């Protein structure tokens, strides 16, 4: 069946345990598509439906488990994390996934915090002004 081709045993078991299985199947399918778009592949490059699996942690939060070719592609791209957000109504399902790579994490860590940079520049400017003002104060000092 379509469900067996597309969804893992765990995904099917979860969806079938809900009051509206169709909505949960649709949401998981949207999640698979979102993950593959985040990887830049879609269902191509040898990636099968079962290569992307949506599971839930102990608190019910969805997370992605990659298998087969999808895992290989993610590893090739240096994907470190794939956060996933799912939402649905009675008639619509939406999923958003983001592929966070080692490179993007490194770039974020190297990025300068604008507030820290401004504070640093202010201190440097203050120090320069104090140095410029020091000779003037020395000449005005009656002890000199």
Regions found by a protein language model. Name each.
Residues 1-144:
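Core catalytic alpha/beta fold that binds nucleotide/phospho-ligands
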């Amino acid at each position: 069946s379509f469900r067996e081709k597309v969804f893992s045993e765990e995904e099917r078991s979860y969806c079938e345990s809900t009051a509206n299985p169709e909505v949960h199947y649709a949401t998981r399918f949207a999640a698979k598509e979102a993950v593959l778009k985040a990887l830049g592949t879609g269902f191509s490059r040898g990636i099968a439906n079962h290569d992307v699996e949506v599971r839930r942690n102990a608190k019910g939060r969805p997370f992605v488990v990659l298998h087969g070719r999808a895992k290989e592609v993610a590893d090739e791209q240096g994907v470190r994390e794939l956060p996933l957000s799912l939402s649905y109504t009675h008639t619509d399902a939406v999923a958003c996934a983001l592929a966070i790579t080692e490179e993007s994490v490194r770039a974020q860590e190297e990025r300068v915090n604008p507030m820290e940079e401004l504070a640093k520049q202010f201190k440097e400017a203050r120090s320069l002004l104090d140095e410029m003002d020091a000779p003037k104060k020395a000449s005005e000092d009656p002890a000199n």
